[in-house]
Amino acid sequence: MNVLIAEDEHDIALLYKMALERRNHQVTTTENGENCLKAYHEKCQNRRFAIHDIGQTLPFDVVILDHKMPKINGMQVAEEILAMNPRQRIIFASAYVKETLTDSIRKLKQVVELMQKPFNVNTLIDTVEDKEIYSELKQLDVDLDIIKAINPTHEQIIDLLKRLRTVQKGRTF
C-alpha cells in the first residue's frame, strides 16, 4: 500500500514509517499540513490523477493525519484532500479526545477513521491494512457503511470476511 503520513512529531512519524515499511508499504512522511498537501498534489500531478475522476485509482491508499500541526491543521488538510478526491481514505491519529474530534469530522461529510493517541504501532498497522479487507468485503456486496457504523475490531472484520468467503464458496449457480 502507498501511505502518506502528516505528523509533526519526528519520532512518531519515524515509528509509523518504519513499522509500515517493515510490512512492505511505501511511506511518504511530512512534518506539517502544508507539506502534506504539497506531497498529495505532487503525487496527483506525477501520476496524472484526475480530480473527481471516480474511475481513477487514488494517489495514496491511505492518508494518516495528526490533528494539531503547524501551518495547516489535519482537519483543513482532510477537507482539501476530500474536495479533490472524495473517496480518499483518511485516518486521524490524534491525542485529542475522540468526542472533540468527532464533531469536526462530521463536518467533513465523509467517512474518516479516528485513532486516539497513544496507541500501539501494531494497532496502526491493523487499521491501515483493513483497507484490503474492506475492498474484498465490497466485492462480496457487503454494505461498508453499515459495517463501519458498527465500528468492529480488526479481528471482527477478519472473522466476518472468513465467514462470507465460506458462504460464497457454498453457493452454486
Residue map of PLM features:
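Active-site residues of response regulator receiver
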Residues: 66
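Receiver (REC) domain active-site loop signature in two-component systems and cognate sites
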Residues: 69
